[in-house]
Regions:
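Ligand-site clamp/hinge motif
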Residues: 206-250, 400-402
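Gly/Pro-rich hinge or "lid" segments in bacterial periplasmic/extracellular proteins
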Residues: 81, 163-213, 217, 226-227, ...
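Alpha-helical secondary-structure segments
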Residues: 116-122, 146, 150, 187-188, ...
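N-terminal lobe/hinge region of extracytoplasmic solute-binding protein
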Residues: 45-92, 124, 184
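Ligand/substrate-recognition segments at binding pockets and active sites
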Residues: 355-426
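Surface-exposed binding/hinge segments that line
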Residues: 91, 95, 100, 133-173, ...
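Detector for C-terminal structural segments
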Residues: 195, 199, 206, 300-332, ...
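Aromatic- and charge-enriched surface segment that lines or borders ligand/interaction sites
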Residues: 88-130, 288-289
Length: 539
C-alpha cells in the first residue's frame, strides 16, 4: 500500500472512529452507512474551531454574530435587513440617542429565564473586550422592567444596530471562568462534549424560543483538510466545507452549493510618498510608486478580475470592484466601472508621465521604474496564486510586481510601505471607517494605505453620527463617490479589490441547509449556520 493511500485509509478510519464513538453512524449488513435522520456530521473548514472557546464577549462570533449557543437581540436576515430575535420589538428615538428593546420571555439552555439584566450584563462585559468594538457611544443601560431594556447613547451612532446584530448575549448567572468551554445560552443548541482539535458534539436546546431544532444532535469535526476530504469521500460527512484547492473534487452522493461572500482578495496600495507621514510605532510609511494615483487607477482599470475567478477560483467567485458590495443598502451604484481595459490603463499612465523609455517592459517616471513589492502570507497558497496572476496582468501595463511571501510579523512591519495582498471583507459599514477614515492611518491594521481625503472623512463622520441607518446610508454612498471625489476608483483609490470569494459546501443528497443569505458574512466557516435550527433530512 503506497503512502498516500495508507494516509487516506488512516484518515477515514480516524474520522469513522470519532463519529462512531458518538453513536452517529450504524453499519448495516450491506456495508453502507445508514443515517440517523435526527443527527448530522458537519465540517466547516480548518479554521472553524475557536481557539479561545465559544465566548462572544471575548470576540467569538464578532465577525458575523453567528452562534450555536447564544442568541442576539437582532440579526441580519436573508435580504440583509434587521430581523428581531430575542427582541420582540424595538424603537429608536428621533435624535438617535435612545434605543429601547422589548424582550421575548425566553429561557436559557439550563432552564433559567433570560432577562433585561442579562442583556445589560452582556453589553457591559463586551465593552471590556477590544475585539467587540463600537460600544464606546453607550452612555448607560437602563432596565425598565425584566423584559425591557433602554440604551442611552452619548451621541448618535448609526452603526449601533449592526453591533447589536453582531453580539450574541450570555446569561449573567452562568458567565464564569471557563464559560467558553461550556457555554450556556438561548441559542438552538447546547454543548455536550468538545475534544479540542478533534470534534464537538452538541444537542438541541429543548428551551429554544423558536422551537426545538429539527436535528437533535450535531457533530462538528475539527480535523485537517486532507482528513476531512477523505471522510467526505467515504460518506461520513453530511456538510463539507470545500476549500478552493478541492473545488473540482467530486463527492459521490453530495451536491455542491456555493454562496457569494463579503470576503475578498484585495491588494493595499500605499497612497503617500516615503517620509510624508510618521507612524506611531516607527514603522516605515509610504511608497514611491503607488503614491502616484495614476498607478493606482491603472491597476484597477487594467486587471482582468474575471480571469482570476475562472482560472484560480474554478468559477466559484465574482469580480470585486470595491469593499462595498452591490447587495448592501449603502452601495453607490455610480462607482461601477469596466475592468480589463489595458489600453485605458496605459493611457492613464502615459498622461501622468509613466513611459517605457528603455524598452525593458517597465514604465518609469523621473528615473523611477514602476517596481512594486507585493507581500502575501507565506502560508496561504491561494494568495500566492492570486499574486502570481495579478503580477502577470500588471506586466501588460508596464508595472512590475516583485512577489515576496512573508510571515505575519514581517507583513505587519512593512504594511504601510509595501503592498499587501490579503483576505478582507464585511457586511458592516463600519469597515469603511476602518479602511478609509484618515485619522485612523497607522492605528494597528486600520487604514494601512494612509488614505486621507477630507471630504471622505466628513462623509464618514456624518454617516456614523446620523440618527438612523437610512440617513447614514446616503453619506456612506457619498464617501464612495459624490460626483467629484470618493474612496472608489472613480475618485481616489487606495486598494485594488480583486474578487469576492464563494463559500462552497458539498451537501449530502436529501439534506437541507435551508434558505441562505444573498451575501454571506466573511467568517471562518460558520456563516451558513445562521439558520441551523431549520437544517434537516428530507422526510
Amino acid at each position: 500500500m503506497n503512502k498516500r493511500l495508507c494516509a487516506a485509509v488512516s484518515a477515514v478510519l480516524s474520522v469513522a472512529f470519532l463519529i462512531g464513538g458518538c453513536g452517529e453512524l450504524a453499519a448495516p449488513k450491506d456495508g453502507k452507512a445508514s443515517k440517523d435522520k435526527s443527527s448530522a456530521v458537519i465540517y466547516l473548514g480548518t479554521r472553524s474551531e475557536p481557539r479561545m472557546g465559544f465566548d462572544p464577549l471575548k470576540g467569538y462570533a464578532n465577525v458575523d454574530g453567528i452562534s450555536l449557543f447564544q442568541s442576539n437581540l437582532l440579526k441580519l436576515n436573508q435580504d440583509l435587513s434587521f430581523e428581531k430575535e430575542i427582541a420582540k420589538d424595538y424603537q429608536i428615538s428621533e435624535d438617535g440617542l435612545t434605543y429601547t428593546f422589548q424582550l421575548r420571555e425566553v429561557k436559557c439552555s439550563d432552564g433559567q429565564p433570560f432577562t433585561a439584566e442579562d442583556v445589560k450584563f452582556s453589553f457591559e462585559e463586551a465593552a471590556k473586550c477590544p475585539l467587540v468594538g463600537n460600544l464606546q457611544d453607550i452612555k448607560s443601560i437602563e432596565i425598565k422592567n425584566p423584559y425591557e431594556v433602554i440604551f442611552h447613547m452619548k451621541q448618535p451612532n448609526s452603526l449601533f444596530l449592526y453591533t447589536v446584530a453582531r453580539l450574541p448575549l450570555v446569561p449573567k448567572h452562568a458567565y464564569k471562568e471557563g464559560y467558553g468551554q461550556n457555554p450556556v445560552g438561548t441559542g438552538p443548541y447546547k454543548m455536550v462534549q468538545w475534544n479540542q482539535g478533534q470534534q464537538m458534539i452538541v444537542e438541541a436546546n429543548e428551551n429554544y424560543f423558536k422551537g426545538i431544532p429539527r436535528l437533535k444532535k450535531l457533530t462538528f469535526l475539527f480535523v485537517n483538510g486532507e482528513t476531512a476530504l477523505q471522510a467526505a469521500k467515504a460518506g461520513d460527512i453530511d456538510v463539507y466545507d470545500v476549500p478552493y484547492n478541492y473545488a473540482d473534487v467530486k463527492i459521490s452522493g453530495a451536491k455542491m452549493k456555493a454562496f457569494k461572500s463579503a470576503g475578498k482578495y484585495v491588494l493595499s496600495l500605499p497612497v503617500v510618498k516615503p517620509g510624508a507621514a510618521i507612524n506611531p510605532d516607527n514603522k516605515p510609511v509610504g511608497n514611491t510608486v503607488t503614491s502616484d494615483i495614476a498607478i493606482r487607477k491603472a491597476l484597477n482599470y487594467g486587471i482582468d478580475r474575471q480571469s482570476i475567478v475562472d482560472n484560480l477560483m474554478h468559477g466559484y467567485g465574482s469580480p470585486a470592484y470595491e469593499l462595498v458590495d452591490p447587495e448592501v443598502p449603502y452601495y453607490n451604484s455610480e462607482i461601477a466601472y469596466k475592468d480589463n481595459d489595458v489600453e485605458k490603463a496605459k493611457a492613464i499612465l502615459a498622461e501622468a508621465g509613466w513611459k517605457d523609455t528603455d524598452g525593458n517592459g517597465i514604465v518609469e517616471k523621473n528615473g523611477q521604474e514602476a517596481n512594486i513589492i507585493v507581500m502575501a502570507n507565506a502560508g496561504d497558497k491561494m494568495l500566492q496564486n492570486v499574486a502570481m496572476l495579478i503580477s502577470d496582468q500588471a506586466k501588460r501595463m508596464g508595472i512590475n510586481f516583485i512577489l515576496e511571501p512573508k510571515s505575519a510579523e514581517e507583513i505587519n512591519a512593512r504594511q504601510h510601505q509595501d503592498c499587501w495582498l490579503m483576505n478582507y471583507g464585511s457586511l458592516d459599514p463600519m469597515n469603511m471607517f476602518y479602511l478609509y477614515y484618515g485619522p485612523n492611518a497607522g492605528k494597528g491594521y486600520y487604514n494601512i494605505s494612509y488614505f486621507n481625503n477630507l471630504k471622505v472623512n466628513g462623509y464618514i463622520e456624518s454617516a456614523m453620527s446620523a440618527p438612523n441607518a437610512e440617513l447614514a446610508n446616503e453619506f456612506w454612498k457619498k464617501a464612495q463617490w459624490d460626483g467629484e471625489t470618493g474612496f472608489s476608483v472613480r475618485g481616489d483609490p487606495s486598494m485594488l479589490w480583486i474578487a469576492n470569494k464563494n463559500y462552497m459546501y458539498q451537501v449530502k443528497e436529501g439534506f437541507s441547509i435551508g434558505e441562505q443569505q444573498s451575501l454571506q458574512p466573511a467568517s471562518m466557516g460558520w456563516a451558513i449556520t445562521r439558520n441551523i435550527e431549520r437544517w434537516g433530512w428530507d422526510e
